[in-house]
Amino acid sequence: MSHFLYLAPEIQLPFSPLTSTEFELIRRKARELWQNEARWSTSSVTTYSGSYREKQLDEASCHRLAQRFGQPHFEYKPAPLPGGSAYNALPGQAGSQEAADGKGRLPDITSPSQDSTLNIKHKVAHQSWSSGTSRPTCLAYRPRHLSPSSKPKRPGFELLMSYRNRGRKLLRQLQRQWDYENKLGSSDDSDTDRFSSVTSGSSRRKFK
């Protein structure tokens, strides 16, 4: 209850739940915690003060960083923004001092110098294209119309075709075997009929 009332002192009660000793104890602990927090904030290297669209270390933080790394005190220079005027004065840009002196300028690839390796490679490539065989035209890369027999077949399609051919061969073999067995059965039946007719005729002759 005492802690809740300390956090919310705007609540007014008709009696005082805290004694003078408890109130002094809470105030002393709060003062110690605040002093420790302020001491840690001042000694921390990562503590800095910033503003909108700009991160800049204050003088105390810069001084602490310089003392920690053994470097002299340095001044912070804000980084140029893409939309600002400082972007036009970058090294190598038109109108800057380094561009006027020729420093920091990137090599112009479109117009290489005579002694550069890029120019030499360009000449060698041009010679290899111009000498010997002629340059391939766009017509040479057009796909030719393939005949139905010479079209490339897919592995799955070829596998299905082989299975279909095997099935047809198996059906033909079974049909031939079935026809052969039917022929054998019909010939056996005719032989038995002949034998029965002969035996019946001989028996009739004996009985006569």
Swiss-Prot record:
Pfam families, per the entry: DUF4722
Compositional bias segments (type: Polar residues): 127-136
InterPro entries assigned to the protein according to its UniProt record, in alphabetical order: DUF4722
Region (Disordered), start-end ranges: 91-115, 127-156, 182-208
Designated name of the protein: Uncharacterized protein C4orf51 homolog
Organism for this UniProt entry: Rattus norvegicus
Classification lineage: Eukaryota, Metazoa, Chordata, Craniata, Vertebrata
